[in-house]
């Protein structure tokens, strides 16, 4: 009996994870995770295309990946040395 409860709970958790990642917006729309409503993906899309479409969100909002910085991109010391050399 206890194993059935654990198994059914695990199934509910697995389904919740899969459902939480479903984005049911039309292709020209994107999910607004705060309101769970579909919004136009860009200015060319008419707002009525996305009306009455909702997206199911049960997990944290998707995070956009930040672009990778090349090594030394934040190192301003070489630029400062070049500026000092040109002033001398």
Swiss-Prot record:
It is found in: Secreted. It comes from the Eukaryota. Expressed by the venom gland. Keywords: Disulfide bond, Secreted, Signal, Toxin. Contains 3 disulfide bonds. Residues 79-88 form a propeptide. GO terms for cellular component: extracellular region. Residues 1-24 form the signal peptide. GO terms for molecular function: toxin activity. Residues 66-88 are annotated as: Disordered. Belongs to the scoloptoxin-XY family. This is U-scoloptoxin(XY)-Er1b. It comes from Ethmostigmus rubripes. The lineage of its organism: Eukaryota, Metazoa, Ecdysozoa, Arthropoda, Myriapoda.
